Amino acid sequence: MGRAILPTTYSRADAIFNISRTPLVIEALRSGDLDLLRKVMDDKIHQPYRLELISAGVKAYQVAKEFGAVALSGAGPSLICFVEPEKAIAAMTSIMAAIEEQGFVARGLITKPSMLGTHTI
């Protein structure tokens, strides 16, 4: 369903908007620059469409934006929020509350980035 809602074509401006941010996202993740990440995580290719599929998504997205850089992740109804470690619990709790206030069950997970790259666990 996540991919089915996407348009079959996009404007040149929207494609350029997304593509031009790719190196900045990589640099923000590499350097840990959360201010830069907050600025470059907006998207015009799939977020506006997929957010509609997540019943509590718009509210959760708004709450998450208060804590850090947010983007829809994958083809399913998941949100990812990059925040400073000291804000992680508050961000997760607030996002889950926003989802649960709309009558849905929410599950949160706090992780840390791995510098190992792809590997077998």
Which positions does each model-derived feature cover?
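Anionic-ligand binding region
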Residues: 1-28
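Glycine-rich, charge-dense phosphate/pyrophosphate-binding loop(s)
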Residues: 18-19, 29-121
